[in-house]
Curated annotation (Swiss-Prot):
PANTHER family: LIPOYL SYNTHASE, LIPOYL SYNTHASE, MITOCHONDRIAL. Residues 156-377 form the Radical SAM core domain. One of its GO terms (molecular function) is 4 iron, 4 sulfur cluster binding. Pfam families: LIAS_N (PF16881), Radical_SAM (PF04055). Residues 33-51 have a biased composition (Polar residues). The lineage of its organism: Eukaryota, Fungi, Dikarya, Ascomycota, Pezizomycotina. This is Lipoyl synthase, mitochondrial. Its cofactor is [4Fe-4S] cluster. Pathway: Protein modification; protein lipoylation via endogenous pathway; protein N(6)-(lipoyl)lysine from octanoyl-[acyl-carrier-protein]: step 2/2. It comes from the Eukaryota.
Length: 425
C-alpha cells in the first residue's frame, strides 16, 4: 500500500510540474531543435492577438491578377485587351458584388441595362385608376405581374391611347409557370358574380380607348372561366360601345368550344401567348401548357370568327437560339396568327427562372423586321414591350384605323383583309 501511494504521489508531482510551466517546456524544446530554415513556432493564445491580420482580397486586386503582367503591359504584348468590344460583349450581363446577409459574405448581383430602367409611377391618372380598382375589388395583371410599364400605360395624358389590363377570376392561378409572379393555388376561391359589371363600370369611368382582359388559369372550373370572360365583354360593350376589347386567354385545357365561345362574344382581338420557343416551353411554362396546344387555341379562335385578329407574345432572354425563333415564327404564321410581340423576360423574384440574356434593342428591332417580312400584320418589339403594352396605340394607329380607311384620300387603296363590320361590333 505504501508503494502504491508513493507511485501516485510521484505521478501527481510530475503532472503538477508540467501544468505549472507548459510554455517554458515548449520554448525549451523549440530552441533545442530549431534551425535557421524551420518554420516559426505556433504562437500561443496570448501572443496571437498581437500579430497583424491577413488583409482580405479586393475586387481591384482580383482584376489586376487576371490582367497582363507588368512586363507584358510595358512591352505592349497585351494589346488585345484594348481592342473594341463587339456587340455581344458590350451588352453582356454586368455583375457587381454586393454585401449579402450578415455573416455570409458578398454575392453576385446583375445590373439592369439602362434601357430597362423605368420611372416610378406617380401621376394623378395612375392614382385615380388604382383607387377605382381597389374600390371595385378588381385585379390587374399590371400589378400582379409587376409590369415595368405601369406608369406609362396608366399615367399617360392621352386617355384614348392609354391601356389597362384587367385580370379576371381572382389573383390566384391553378398553374405555376416559372416566369410568372402571380401566386399559385390548387383550388382558388369562387368567382365574383359582380366582376363583369364592376369591370364595365370602371372602364366606362376611365374613358380608355383600349382594354385588355386577361385572367388567371382556372383549371378547377368546368369551363375554365370562358362564360365569365364572355359576360364581361358583353357588359363592357353595353356600357362603352366605342372601347376596343382584347381578350388574352389561357388554353382552357384544350376545350376549343370554350375558345369559340369567347371568340364570338363581341371582342376585337383574341390573344393567347405562346410565351417562348417550342424547345424551351417545358422548362418555362407549366407542364399542362404546350406550344402545340397554344397554336391550336389560336387556330380555333380564327375558325370560330375568321375576321378576328389573333395575337400572341413571346419573351426573349430565356436562352433561345435563332433557329428556334425562326421555327416558332414559321409555325405561328402557318396558324394564321396576325400579330406578334417580343419583349425582354424580367425575373420577378429569386425563385423564378434567371435571365439568360438581356437582349439588345438592336436585336429586338431585327426580329421586328424579320417578322414583318414573314407577313405578320403588326409587330411590336422592344425590351419593355409586353403583350398589352400600348396595345391601344398599336392597334388603333396601325391596324384598326387603317382597316377603316381613316385618313385616306378618296380613291386611295384601303386594305380590307379584316372586314370593317367585324371590328366595329
Amino acid at each position: 500500500m505504501a508503494a502504491s501511494s508513493t507511485r501516485l504521489r510521484c505521478l501527481y508531482a510530475s503532472s503538477s510540474t508540467w501544468k505549472t510551466s507548459p510554455s517554458q517546456s515548449l520554448i525549451s524544446l523549440s530552441r533545442r531543435y530549431a534551425t535557421t530554415s524551420s518554420a516559426p513556432p505556433t504562437p500561443s493564445d496570448e501572443s496571437s492577438s498581437t500579430l497583424p491580420k491577413r488583409r482580405k482580397t479586393t475586387t481591384f486586386k482580383d482584376k489586376l491578377n487576371a490582367g497582363p503582367s507588368f512586363a507584358d503591359f510595358v512591352s505592349g504584348n497585351g494589346d488585345s485587351n484594348n481592342a473594341p468590344l463587339d456587340a455581344s460583349e458590350a451588352y453582356a450581363l454586368e455583375t457587381v458584388m454586393i454585401p449579402g446577409p450578415a455573416g455570409r459574405g458578398k454575392k453576385e448581383h446583375t445590373r439592369l441595362p439602362s434601357w430597362l430602367k423605368t420611372p416610378i409611377p406617380d401621376s394623378t391618372n395612375y392614382k385615380r385608376i388604382k383607387k377605382d380598382l381597389r374600390g371595385l375589388k378588381l385585379n390587374t395583371v399590371c400589378e400582379e405581374a409587376r409590369c415595368p410599364n405601369i406608369s406609362d400605360c396608366w399615367g399617360g395624358s392621352d386617355k384614348s391611347a392609354a391601356t389597362a389590363t384587367i385580370m379576371l377570376m381572382g389573383d390566384s392561378c391553378t398553374r405555376g409557370c416559372r416566369f410568372c409572379s402571380v401566386k399559385t393555388l390548387r383550388t382558388p376561391g369562387p368567382l365574383d358574380p359582380h366582376e363583369p359589371e364592376n369591370t364595365a363600370e370602371a372602364l366606362s369611368r376611365w374613358g380608355l380607348g383600349y382594354v385588355v382582359l386577361t385572367s388567371v388559369d382556372r383549371d378547377d372550373l368546368s369551363d375554365g372561366g370562358a362564360h365569365h370572360f364572355a359576360e364581361t365583354v358583353i357588359k363592357i360593350k353595353q356600357k362603352a360601345p366605342g372601347i376596343l376589347v382584347e381578350c388574352l386567354t389561357g388554353d382552357f385545357a384544350g376545350d376549343f368550344d370554350m375558345v369559340a365561345l369567347v371568340a364570338k362574344s363581341g371582342l376585337d382581338v383574341y390573344a393567347h401567348n405562346v410565351e417562348t420557343v417550342e424547345a424551351l416551353t417545358p422548362h418555362v411554362r407549366d407542364r399542362r401548357a404546350t406550344f402545340q396546344q397554344s397554336l391550336r387555341v389560336l387556330e380555333a379562335a380564327k375558325r370560330a370568327k375568321p375576321s378576328l385578329i389573333t395575337k400572341t407574345s413571346m419573351m426573349l432572354g430565356f436562352g433561345e437560339t435563332e433557329d428556334q425563333m425562326w421555327d416558332a415564327l414559321r409555325q405561328l404564321r402557318a396558324s394564321n396568327v396576325d400579330v406578334v410581340t417580343f419583349g425582354q423576360y424580367m425575373r420577378p423574384t429569386k425563385r423564378h427562372m434567371a435571365v439568360h440574356e438581356y437582349v439588345t434593342p438592336d436585336k429586338f428591332e431585327l426580329w421586328r423586321q424579320r417578322a414583318l417580312e414573314m407577313g405578320f400584320l403588326y409587330v411590336a418589339s422592344g425590351p419593355l414591350v409586353r403583350s398589352s403594352y400600348k396595345a391601344g396605340e398599336a392597334f388603333i394607329e396601325n391596324v384598326l384605323k387603317k382597316r377603316r380607311g381613316v385618313g385616306n384620300t378618296p380613291g386611295a387603296e384601303v386594305t380590307t383583309e379584316v372586314p370593317v363590320d367585324a371590328l366595329a361590333k
